[in-house]
């Protein structure tokens, strides 16, 4: 079994490419993680997700603790076996979903008490419980429990939230069961305030996490402000540890973030957009529902290797999506995930060659 490690093989300005070694295989970085929130990437077979080029996918503590429960998944052999995915899995701590989905939530020093958005049942999620759930799931990369600071927020509110996240990070770190090839990442907060981001990073770096995530971005602040934060926040983190920008996945955002030193990304954009009939291509986005595609006998992209492009026309995809056929969601999602993995692969190649990349400026 491989030890968890991160080796940077190439660097161009602030952009890095390398390999994360884990108990479940290697992750090429920069890496884009498809989101498999409930133990599945919507409208995709796990083996099909791997065929798009994904080295790792994301699962979610909040959703899996509610259905079918972490204990049941553990009894059935863990999340990898449960969903037939033998590559690395990173699990979100559940904090963001508790804040965004649950009603009647109450945040205390202990954790967050909340009602399930499914049936109203009462739950308590603490740093210790979140870490234990991720252990039961068998997550390759466990995320520390945090409070995702909303936007807009005052300096004092952001400071209070960041300090709570730091205290929770201590408890998450203490609760983590170390195993060879497995890792735990801390999450820095601080909203758009440089002083708070630096304080947060300093507190977490002292805990010697295996990697670090930048949370609390892509929550409404806009690209310009997000990039402003990314101009300084990665510099507060160790050079030899992976850096993960949570919830960010627009192509232009990925490119801008890699140029600022980010190594890992996740986002629902390619899958959600695919199910809604939007395709990403090198020529821009295509809304396949548009009537102008009803008689278009060309593929979405001529040089794309995905089944949607090699076997079907825009007219057929238009038909499937317009009538709500499941195959339409499957093909559009497959295409988008292939596009995103091809994009990230091109970025890795440009870094290796020492070339600037700005495909979406």
Curated annotation (Swiss-Prot):
Pathway: tRNA modification; tRNA-queuosine biosynthesis
EC assignment: 2.4.2.29
Chain segments carrying region RNA binding: 247-253, 271-275
Entries under InterPro entries matching the protein: ArchSynthase1/Queuine_TRR (IPR050076), TGT (IPR004803), TGT-like_sf (IPR036511), tRNA_ribo_trans-like (IPR002616)
Any one GO CC term of the record: cytoplasm
Annotated catalytic residues: 92 (proton acceptor), 266 (nucleophile)
UniProt keyword Glycosyltransferase, yes or no: yes
Keywords for the protein's UniProt record, in alphabetical order: Glycosyltransferase, Metal-binding, Queuosine biosynthesis, Transferase, tRNA processing, Zinc
Reaction equation(s) it catalyzes: 7-aminomethyl-7-carbaguanine + guanosine(34) in tRNA = 7-aminomethyl-7-carbaguanosine(34) in tRNA + guanine
GO molecular-function terms, A-Z: metal ion binding; tRNA-guanosine(34) queuine transglycosylase activity
Cofactor(s) named in the record: Zn(2+)
Keyword presence, Glycosyltransferase: yes
Binding of Zn(2+), residues: 304, 306, 309, 335
Annotated binding of substrate, by residue: 92-96, 146, 189, 216
Transmembrane segments: none
Cofactor binding note of this UniProt entry: Binds 1 zinc ion per subunit.
A Pfam family: TGT
GO BP annotations, alphabetical order: queuosine biosynthetic process; tRNA wobble guanine modification; tRNA-guanine transglycosylation
Subunit structure: Homodimer. Within each dimer, one monomer is responsible for RNA recognition and catalysis, while the other monomer binds to the replacement base PreQ1.
NCBIfam families: Q_tRNA_tgt (TIGR00430), tgt_general (TIGR00449)
Family from the record: Belongs to the queuine tRNA-ribosyltransferase family.
Annotated function: Catalyzes the base-exchange of a guanine (G) residue with the queuine precursor 7-aminomethyl-7-deazaguanine (PreQ1) at position 34 (anticodon wobble position) in tRNAs with GU(N) anticodons (tRNA-Asp, -Asn, -His and -Tyr). Catalysis occurs through a double-displacement mechanism. The nucleophile active site attacks the C1' of nucleotide 34 to detach the guanine base from the RNA, forming a covalent enzyme-RNA intermediate. The proton acceptor active site deprotonates the incoming PreQ1, allowing a nucleophilic attack on the C1' of the ribose to form the product.
Name of this chain's protein: Queuine tRNA-ribosyltransferase
Organism: Rickettsia akari (strain Hartford)
Gene giving rise to this polypeptide: tgt
């Amino acid at each position: 079994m491989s030890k968890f490690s991160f080796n940077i093989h190439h660097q161009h300005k602030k952009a890095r490419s390398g390999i994360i070694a884990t108990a479940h295989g290697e992750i090429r970085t920069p890496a884009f993680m498809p989101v498999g929130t409930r133990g599945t990437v919507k409208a995709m077979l796990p083996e099909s997700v791997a065929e798009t080029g994904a080295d790792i996918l994301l699962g979610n503590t909040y959703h899996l603790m509610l259905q079918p429960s972490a204990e049941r998944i553990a009894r059935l052999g863990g999340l990898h076996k449960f969903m037939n995915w033998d590559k690395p899995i990173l699990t979100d701590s559940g904090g963001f979903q508790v804040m965004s989905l649950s009603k009647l939530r109450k945040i205390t020093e202990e954790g967050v008490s909340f009602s399930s958005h499914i049936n109203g049942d009462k739950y308590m999620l603490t740093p210790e419980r979140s870490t234990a759930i991720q252990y039961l799931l068998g997550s390759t990369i466990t995320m520390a429990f945090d409070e995702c600071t909303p936007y807009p927020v005052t300096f004092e509110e952001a400071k209070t939230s960041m300090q709570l996240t730091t205290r929770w990070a201590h408890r998450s770190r203490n609760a983590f069961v170390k195993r060879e090839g497995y890792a735990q990442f801390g999450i820095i907060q601080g909203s758009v305030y440089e002083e708070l981001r630096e304080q947060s990073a300093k507190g977490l770096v002292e805990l010697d996490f295996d990697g670090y995530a930048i949370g609390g971005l892509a929550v409404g602040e806009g690209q310009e402000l997000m990039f402003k934060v990314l101009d300084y926040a990665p510099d507060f983190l160790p050079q030899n540890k992976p850096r993960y920008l949570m919830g960010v996945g627009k192509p232009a955002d990925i490119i801008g973030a890699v140029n600022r030193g980010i190594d890992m990304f996740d986002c629902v954009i390619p899958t959600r957009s695919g199910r809604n009939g939007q395709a990403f291509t090198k020529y821009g986005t295509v809304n396949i529902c548009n009537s102008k595609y009803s008689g278009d006998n060309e593929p979405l992209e001529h040089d794309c290797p995905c089944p949607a492009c090699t076997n079907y026309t825009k007219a057929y995809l238009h038909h499937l999506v317009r009538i709500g056929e499941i195959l339409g969601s499957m093909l559009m999602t497959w295409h988008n995930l292939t596009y995103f993995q091809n994009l990230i692969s091109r970025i890795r190649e440009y870094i290796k060659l020492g070339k600037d990349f700005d495909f979406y400026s």
